[in-house]
């Protein structure tokens, strides 16, 4: 009987560590999701700024001088 009790205790210990690991991983996933959301917001701000640039500041494809190898 002692062997069965030891096995049960070992399984309970492993389960406790797995629960802790799952919780730690969950917290990391939450942090990463927040980071991704922040980065998406920053990208949207950059897109808005790029779209707001006046076209006169940028040369069109026809106005660009061709590279020297042409």
From Swiss-Prot:
Record-linked Pfam families: SlyX
InterPro entries listed in its UniProt record: SlyX (IPR007236)
PANTHER family, A to Z: PROTEIN SLYX
Membership in a protein family: Belongs to the SlyX family.
Protein name: Protein SlyX homolog
């Amino acid at each position: 009987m002692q062997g069965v009790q030891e096995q049960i205790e070992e399984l309970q210990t492993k389960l406790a560590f797995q629960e802790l690991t799952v919780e730690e991983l969950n917290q990391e996933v939450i942090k990463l999701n927040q980071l991704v959301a922040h980065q998406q917001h920053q990208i949207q701000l950059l897109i808005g700024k790029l779209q707001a640039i006046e076209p006169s500041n940028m040369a069109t494809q026809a106005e660009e001088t061709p590279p020297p190898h042409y």
